[in-house]
C-alpha cells in the first residue's frame, strides 16, 4: 500500500538558468519562484552577481534587480555548468561585457567551438585559450547564422547575443531544439514588436 504524501519538486534547471539571465538584463525587479536549487544554477547566480546583477534569495523565491551588467573584476567560474558557460558567453557578448569564463576539469573537456564560431560571425570578439573563453568588448552585428548542432544551448547563446545586435539575427538550425529561450523572451516582452526567427529542418532533442 502506498501512502499519499505531498512532494515539492525542484524547478526545471534549463528554465532556471534562462530566467536568471533574462531577468539580469531586464528593467526593474523580477521575482522568480521555484528555481532549481542545484549546483549548476548556483554557478549562474554567482557569475551574474559578479557581473553586477543584484540577486536576493528569500524563503520561497529569488528577486533579481538589474538593468545593465558590468565587467567582472575576476574570471567567472562556471564550475561544471556547460549551460552557464555557453549561454552566459552569448549574453555577455551582446551586453558588450569584457570577461573570462572558465570551468572545472570536466567542463574544460566539453566542446566550446560550437558557440565560439557563430558568435564570431555575429561580431563577437572572443577566443578560446587554455580552456578559457576570453571575451572582449564586442559589437554584435547580427545577420544570418547557421547552427548545425542539435543543441538548445548553442541556439540560446546566439539568441541572447543577438538581442542587442545592430541588425536582426536569423538563425537556421539543422534540427529543432527546445524553445525555452524564445518563449521566455517573448513572454517577458509582451508589448514589444520583437520577433524571433528560428528555422528548423528536422527534430532532435537538444540540451
Give each language-model segment a name.
Residues 1-207:
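Structural preference for solvent-exposed beta-strand-turn elements
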Amino acid at each position: 500500500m502506498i501512502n499519499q504524501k505531498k512532494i515539492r519538486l525542484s524547478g526545471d534547471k534549463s528554465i532556471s538558468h534562462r530566467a536568471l539571465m533574462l531577468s539580469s538584463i531586464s528593467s526593474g525587479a523580477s521575482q522568480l519562484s521555484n528555481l532549481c536549487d542545484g549546483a549548476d544554477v548556483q554557478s549562474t547566480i554567482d557569475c551574474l552577481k559578479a557581473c553586477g546583477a543584484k540577486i536576493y534569495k528569500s524563503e520561497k523565491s529569488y528577486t533579481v534587480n538589474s538593468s545593465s551588467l558590468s565587467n567582472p573584476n575576476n574570471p567567472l567560474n562556471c564550475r561544471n555548468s556547460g549551460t552557464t558557460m555557453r549561454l552566459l558567453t552569448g549574453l555577455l557578448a551582446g551586453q558588450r561585457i569584457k570577461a573570462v569564463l572558465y570551468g572545472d576539469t570536466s567542463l574544460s573537456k566539453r566542446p566550446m567551438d560550437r558557440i565560439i564560431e557563430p558568435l564570431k560571425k555575429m561580431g563577437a570578439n572572443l577566443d578560446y585559450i587554455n580552456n578559457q573563453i576570453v571575451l572582449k568588448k564586442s559589437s554584435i552585428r547580427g545577420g544570418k547564422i547557421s547552427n548545425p548542432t542539435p543543441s538548445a544551448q548553442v541556439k540560446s547563446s546566439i539568441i541572447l547575443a543577438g538581442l542587442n545586435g545592430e541588425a536582426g539575427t536569423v538563425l537556421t538550425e539543422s534540427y529543432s531544439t527546445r524553445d525555452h529561450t524564445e518563449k521566455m523572451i517573448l513572454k517577458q516582452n509582451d508589448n514589444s514588436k520583437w520577433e524571433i526567427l528560428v528555422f528548423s529542418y528536422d527534430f532532435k532533442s537538444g540540451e
